[in-house]
Curated annotation (Swiss-Prot):
One of its GO terms (cellular component) is small ribosomal subunit. Part of the 30S ribosomal subunit. Contacts proteins S4 and S8. Keywords: Ribonucleoprotein, Ribosomal protein, RNA-binding, rRNA-binding. Residues 17-80 form the S5 DRBM domain. One of its GO terms (molecular function) is structural constituent of ribosome. InterPro entries: Ribosomal_Su5_D2-typ_SF, Ribosomal_uS5, Ribosomal_uS5_bac-type, Ribosomal_uS5_C, Ribosomal_uS5_N, Ribosomal_uS5_N_CS, Ribsml_uS5_D2-typ_fold_subgr. The gene is rpsE. Pfam families: Ribosomal_S5 (PF00333), Ribosomal_S5_C (PF03719). This is Small ribosomal subunit protein uS5. The N-terminal domain interacts with the head of the 30S subunit; the C-terminal domain interacts with the body and contacts protein S4. The interaction surface between S4 and S5 is involved in control of translational fidelity. Belongs to the universal ribosomal protein uS5 family. It comes from Treponema pallidum (strain Nichols).
Length: 172
C-alpha cells in the first residue's frame, strides 16, 4: 500500500521538472564474439524557477542510461539566482579545458549561448542571458564549467543580509 502512495508522489514531482538530453554517446568494447555496445547519457534537469542539476549515466541500454542520468541530475540540484529572467551579474568559470562566460542581458534579448549552455539556461528558467564558451567544447566539461559559474552567482537578498545592508543600497 505504501509503495503505491510513494509512486504517486514521484509522478507528481516528475511533472514539475524539465529534462534535456545534452549528449548521448555509444561506446564499443571489442570482445571475442564481436562488439559489445554501451551507452552514456548527459542530461540537465530543472524546474524553470531557478533550480537546476546535471547527471551522467552509463548503461547497456539507451533508455536505462538516460534514466540513470536524470536520477542523478535530480539529486544534484542547485539553486540558480535569477533576477527578472537573467542572472544578477557577470561571471566566468573554468573547468579543465573549458571556460564559460555568462553575462546578464536586457529583457527581450533571449538566450544567446551554445547548445550545452543554452540547455542549462532553458531548464533553469533564464530567459535573457549572454554566454560564450571558450576552449574545449567537451559537453561534460562545459556543463561543469557552467555549474561552476552558477555557483559563483550571488543572490542580492542573501548578500545584503550577510553584509547587514539594505537591498536598495546593494543593487539599487
Amino acid at each position: 500500500m505504501d509503495r503505491h502512495r510513494d509512486f504517486g508522489k514521484d509522478r507528481l514531482r516528475d511533472k514539475e521538472f524539465t529534462e534535456k538530453l545534452i549528449k548521448l554517446n555509444r561506446t564499443a568494447k571489442v570482445v571475442k564474439g564481436g562488439r559489445r555496445f554501451s551507452f552514456s547519457a548527459l542530461t540537465v534537469v530543472g524546474d524553470q524557477k531557478g533550480r537546476v542539476g546535471f547527471g551522467f549515466g552509463k548503461a547497456g541500454d539507451v533508455s536505462e542510461a538516460i534514466r540513470k542520468s536524470v536520477e542523478r541530475a535530480k539529486r544534484s540540484m542547485v539553486l540558480f539566482p535569477l533576477k527578472d529572467g537573467t542572472i544578477p551579474h557577470e561571471v566566468q568559470a573554468k573547468f579543465k579545458g573549458s571556460l564559460v562566460l555568462l553575462r546578464p542581458a536586457c529583457s527581450g534579448t533571449g538566450i544567446i549561448a551554445g547548445g550545452t549552455v543554452r540547455a542549462i539556461m532553458e531548464v533553469a528558467g533564464a530567459t535573457d542571458v549572454l554566454s560564450k564558451s571558450l576552449g574545449s567544447n567537451s559537453a561534460i566539461n562545459v556543463v561543469r564549467a557552467t555549474f561552476g559559474a552558477v555557483a559563483q552567482l550571488m543572490d542580492a537578498r542573501k548578500l545584503a543580509r550577510e553584509r547587514g545592508k539594505a537591498l536598495v543600497d546593494m543593487w539599487g
